[in-house]
């Protein structure tokens, strides 16, 4: 289950890069604005990581993971409502906040469930989900975006995340 959630964690964050040309055309975004969209998620994610770890130490890890999954998935879907740069920037930053709780909680769970003999293997397997999500997210967001519009990419990814969390 952690592996699949992590796939969506990375697919959702990667999706925007594959639809940059569509966003640029529809919203007349500048290269600087595209760069800011690309980094908004990372700034919030990076700045909130320590706080997220402290929160995860005080709540049930499963709650942090599933709560984060629902929050970031709903925000991902809401991204489709964007009509300008400010909306996109807000949703990207908010999604970064939602996703920041996943890794502290998942690494803690993996450490607890796997002893010295299997811990590295478990974390290595989990790490593969990062690349599957990044590659798959980029590919499918671009594919969906080209054929059905960029908004549907975010609706599909976010919707699948919500279903996964149920």
Protein language model features and the residues they cover:
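Extracytoplasmic
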Residues: 1-31
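Small-residue-rich segments within alpha-helical transmembrane domains of MFS-like 12-TM solute carriers
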Residues: 10, 14, 80, 96-104, ...
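Residue-level signature of mid-helix packing/kink "hotspots" within the transmembrane helices
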Residues: 14, 42-50, 134-135
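Helix-breaking motifs and short loop linkers at transmembrane-helix boundaries and internal kinks
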Residues: 28, 60, 81-87, 98, ...
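Conserved MFS/SLC helix-loop-helix module at the cytosolic interface between two early adjacent transmembrane helices
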Residues: 47-85
């Amino acid at each position: 289950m952690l592996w699949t959630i992590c796939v969506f964690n990375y697919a959702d964050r990667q999706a925007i890069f594959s639809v940059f040309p569509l966003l640029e055309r529809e919203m007349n975004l500048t290269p600087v604005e595209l760069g800011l969209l690309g980094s908004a998620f990372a700034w919030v994610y990076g700045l909130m990581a320590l706080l997220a770890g402290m929160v995860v130490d005080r709540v049930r890890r499963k709650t942090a993971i599933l709560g984060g999954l629902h929050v970031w998935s709903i925000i991902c879907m809401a991204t489709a409502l964007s009509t300008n740069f400010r909306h996109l920037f807000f949703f990207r930053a908010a999604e970064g906040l939602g996703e920041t709780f996943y890794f502290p909680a998942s690494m803690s769970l993996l450490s607890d469930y796997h002893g010295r003999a299997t811990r590295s293997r478990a974390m290595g397997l989990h790490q593969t989900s990062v690349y599957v999500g990044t590659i798959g997210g980029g590919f499918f967001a671009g594919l969906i975006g080209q054929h059905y519009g960029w908004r549907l990419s975010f609706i599909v990814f976010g919707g699948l995340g919500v279903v996964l969390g149920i």
